[in-house]
Amino acid sequence: MTDSYEVGTVSADGRFDVARPALDLLVWDAPNIDMTLATVIGARPTAASRPRFDAIAAWFVDGAEDPTAPEPPDVEACVFANVPPQHVTSLQRWVEALRSFGYAVFARPKLQPDDDIDQSMLDHISMRAHSNRLRRLVVFSGDGRNFAEPLEDLARAGTEVVVVAFSEVAGYAISSELLQFIDIEDVPGAFAAPLDRVRLDALPADGAWLRPTKSLRDAANLFAARRSA
């Protein structure tokens, strides 16, 4: 992973100052966005159903304000993305939009189907935890395989760790006694309109129907094909 761009105070000899500046850090696992959205709403994501990064940036910065602190913490928001060669042109505009909203973007070519960005995210979090006093860490990811243990370690060390994801896919954060969880749809302005989903953690008193995400015939045909394979 290429060295992250620097924030914070550096002493004359090139080392980070002993009085490490406070930092609120947001990291976002971008490769999961459309896949997770499709799982949650049972349809191909559209522009209207994708999260608004500008609104989320405003929410994150607002959460860094602390009237009791002598000075506000530094704030940094980073999006991590795998870039398939065939999608370079279409992703270029998206990356530039993110940068214009104040996000740093770590982009890496996706050369193999199983290429993952998680370790790059964890490396950056670790670096910031050493170079700064990591006051608050906000992680946009529902992937608990790689994040649960290191995030809980940071929480034990005194960092406020918040996981933002869809409740349908973030069981590791919801069940954790150390991590805070926020459903992404509860972030003010995160979506232009309510998503077509029914949340089990926010059911109406008289109940709600959860529509199938695949037709009954398609599901039966898929089962039959697997059985005969």
Predicted regions and their residues:
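Domain-level signal for Mg2+-assisted phosphodiester chemistry and nucleotide/NA-binding surfaces
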Residues: T2-D115
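Nuclease catalytic cores that cleave nucleic-acid phosphodiester bonds
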Residues: T89-S228
